Amino acid sequence: MNSNVHHRKPRLVFFQWDHQPNANAAGYLLLHMQQQAKCLATHFDVVIISRDCDYAEICDRYEPDLTLFESGYRSHGSRRIKITNTNTHVAVPKLGLHNADPWCDRRAGFLSDMEQWGIETYFAIATMTPEYMPAVKENLFVWPNFIDPEVYHDYGQQKVIPVTLTGQVYGLYPWRQTVFPMIRDRYPCLVSPQHAYESKLASQLLSGEAYARALNASLVVPTCGTMGGEVVRKHFEIPGAKACLVTERTAAVEAAGFVDMENCVFVDGHNVVERLDYLFAHPDEIQRITTAGHSLIHSRHTVNHRPQIYQWFLLNKGLQFGEKIIQSGPFGELAKVKRVAKHESVHIVGKASDRALLNQGDLLLEQDRVGEAKHCYARCLDYVSYLPEAKFRLAICALREGDADRAYDLLVDLVKVTVIEYGAVDPDPVEWAYFLLALICKGQLERARRLQDFYPSLSHEEFRRARLVIAQLGCSGGVVAGLYGRERKSIHQVPDRSDSEWLTWFDNILERCQQPDLANVLRQAPAGGSGTSAKVTAPYFKGDAGWRLRLYSGVDGLMVKLRLTNLRPNVPPLPEFRYLRHLVRALVPKSQRGAMRWIRTALSWPPV
């Protein structure tokens, strides 16, 4: 670390994705990322690295006092950068930044990144993230959204727009779906079109100063924080530009300091018309609320009011044995406490609609009311079509209903999102464990056995149990080593069962999936994998690998034997993961890939 830290701002190297491609689409996303760097610069000498790089080289060149790694972003054109040699310069503290929605399907990728980079402390921009990643909430702090006061302020615009309606209005935003049409049908409105982030049409949307001036010219502007009850940037941008915020009452919004009819207006589908009629009939009330909201934002929610990362840096430098750092709330400061005092960070306990449905479905599934549980999980997808917790639970429901193929397809999709679409080194450990179990339920035990070590750094209790099943069904004595190392974090929460309870549960799953022979072997195997009971002789099971699958497996094994692991695809050697396509991309220059298409086409046929 640089010895001049006391004579200047500490130096922070921020490994930020390359967000520049958004300049040609949703330019406001690029502005958000630039504002994050500006906020960090209030306390740090910030160096931005947005390219593939060697961590050791960067640290040697810039001598940082702290490094911050952006991760978990759901790319809308942004490029995830590759960082190597992160196990060097251990004296430099490292932080992860979950720069995404709390329900994002890249959370498993975020956790994989943190593991690979050796990061154990994280910040998130969303106040609800601890509820969506409970496995890491003890070391997770909130660096909440904010505004740039140089952009969002009172421009003195004449209030010529009664209502401005801006933002997306699809399933993720049920409050807007209810309230916006009621407002649009009754009052004169400036309505912004809805364009996807990655659409070129998004470049036509108002952003920056133009957007702030439109807000400043508006009397009232409604917004909400999604089905998750989050605090989004619009909650701060609207009053920051001196317009009256009309919004949904949530725990997170109240934690930000918003008070009904004092500095904002809380409405729902039952009273929105009544309340807006009152406000438009009493312009002095609108002005009073607007002024108070403007004051709240500029005194608490600008780039100058987000010192949490800097506070962590200072506290961590003097952290003693037996001490830890906690946060007083999502917008609160960080402080040191004694571990023996058992103080914890204060997180928002909200009423996110998807969490409520997941909990309801879990209770129904526990009662074996699978159909009703499926309905709850499917309703989650109406809010977030890619929600991994809902898809994972639907896979469990499919296994309970004996539909191993459906479960397998869902689990394949989950693994694909993390290792292919996001590009993580390995998938969520629980998703991988149940992917292997789904293979077994399809009668493909040998394939599961071959794949169980494909991601060697994965370690989790559910994965250990999947390996135990493979060992017992393969009659290898049923002895499985414990966890390979520290248990990997998962975004999924599974029922708390003993090994014997879990094995009984999976034995039942095998029966439902029409695998009575496998179920019988598992039923007679020593519970818990102790290996102390008499070995069970397994019946003959037909090999489950056709010639194409054997070829895929053979090619992958050859890559390992030839020590070409740096070119080996990071996906299982199976057609459904497009293994050959990834192999060709690694081995063949772009100019020569056309000649390989016929091979890829032949090998992509359904396995026989």
Regions found by a protein language model. Name each.
Residues 1-97, 109-121, 350-358, 363-368, ...:
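N-terminal pre-catalytic "stem/leader" segment of glycosyltransferase-like enzymes
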Residues 2-62, 69-85, 97-236, 240-241, ...:
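Nucleotide-sugar donor-binding catalytic core of glycosyltransferases
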Residues 268-285, 453:
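C-terminal "capping" alpha-helix adjacent to the active site of nucleotide-linked donor transferases
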Residues 303-348:
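C-terminal alpha-helical cap of glycosyltransferases
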Residues 580-608:
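Long, low-complexity, intrinsically disordered segments
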